[in-house]
């Protein structure tokens, strides 16, 4: 049995392994942990992940006139990466064809539901290998997410709220934070 987490977003959300490692984006993996736990508790068996993705809910500007056919909608989706799901997918090619039955027909162009390019031999293109995970890799990411969440919970329980915003390259969340006057984080000293 396989499960898939889909988090619908109106903006351009994406996740990287670095985001998960630094605890910046735990949402998809947290949802996967909850899904696996709920499935195990209700069904009495384990579930393997098929994918964890952000799916964009857009209201694209489409010329007025006749309704779009499925083929035309797919053509529009192919033209815009903004319509593509973003996240992690199983490395099982057959499973990916169950998510999108036309997955293999997109080849190097990537489809909207499984935006992973394939080579002529129907294996995953090297440029998209970072988007696929085997069951063990999903498990490691879930266990790590669980560990980070447990640490956060312990810190909250202990009354520990250190002012330690992340810095990734030169980016900090403080730039856009409405509460920087409350926390008094001074980037010139820290």
Q: What residue spans do the PLM features occupy?
A:
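Structural signature of nuclease core domains in nucleic-acid processing machines
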Residues: 1-190
């Amino acid at each position: 049995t396989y499960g898939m987490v889909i988090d619908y977003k109106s903006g351009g959300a994406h996740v990287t392994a670095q985001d998960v490692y630094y605890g910046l984006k735990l949402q998809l993996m947290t949802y996967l942990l909850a899904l696996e736990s709920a499935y195990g508790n209700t069904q009495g068996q384990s579930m393997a992940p098929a994918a964890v993705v952000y799916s964009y809910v857009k209201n694209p500007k489409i010329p007025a006139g006749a309704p779009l056919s499925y083929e035309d909608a797919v053509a529009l989706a192919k033209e815009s990466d903004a319509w593509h799901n973003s996240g992690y997918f199983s490395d099982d090619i057959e499973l990916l064809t169950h998510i999108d039955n036309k997955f293999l027909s997109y080849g190097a162009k990537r489809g909207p539901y499984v935006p992973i390019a394939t080579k002529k031999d129907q294996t995953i293109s090297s440029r998209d290998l970072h988007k696929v995970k085997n069951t063990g890799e999903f498990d490691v990411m879930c266990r790590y997410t669980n560990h980070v969440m447990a640490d956060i919970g312990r810190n909250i329980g202990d009354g520990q709220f250190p002012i330690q915003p992340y810095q990734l390259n030169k980016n900090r969340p403080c730039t856009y934070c409405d509460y920087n006057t409350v926390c008094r984080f001074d980037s010139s000293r820290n």
